[in-house]
Amino acid sequence: SDVRNAAVHERQKELVPSKITTCCGYSPGTACPSCMCTNTCKKKNKKPGRRND
């Protein structure tokens, strides 16, 4: 049963990485993609001169 429990813990680690659950130290407990920590999230860039707000 010990091996089975270990497998479950490993699986939970993969599903919920600490970086995502803690948002890299900001607002712990909230879910956010890890790319926000390194500023690598792909943002939709609005074309300059146009206002689509």
From Swiss-Prot:
InterPro entries per the UniProt record, alphabetical: Conotoxin_a-typ
Record's comment on post-translational modification: Contains 3 disulfide bonds.
Record key words, sorted: Amidation, Disulfide bond, Gamma-carboxyglutamic acid, Glycoprotein, Hydroxylation, Ion channel impairing toxin, Neurotoxin, Pyrrolidone carboxylic acid, Secreted, Toxin
Entry's Gene Ontology cellular component terms: extracellular region
Disulfide feature: none
Entry keyword annotation includes Disulfide bond: yes
Tissue distribution: Expressed by the venom duct.
Pfam families: Toxin_8
Glycosylation (residues): S18
Domain of life of the organism encoding this protein: Eukaryota
Proline amide: residues carrying this PTM: P48
GO MF terms, alphabetically ordered: acetylcholine receptor inhibitor activity; ion channel regulator activity; toxin activity
Propeptide: 1-11, 49-53
Coiled coil location: none
Annotated family: Belongs to the conotoxin A superfamily.
Function: Probable neurotoxin with ion channel inhibitor activity.
Domain observations: The cysteine framework is IV (CC-C-C-C-C).
Protein name: Conotoxin Ac4.3b
Organism encoding this protein: Conus achatinus
Source lineage: Eukaryota, Metazoa, Spiralia, Lophotrochozoa, Mollusca
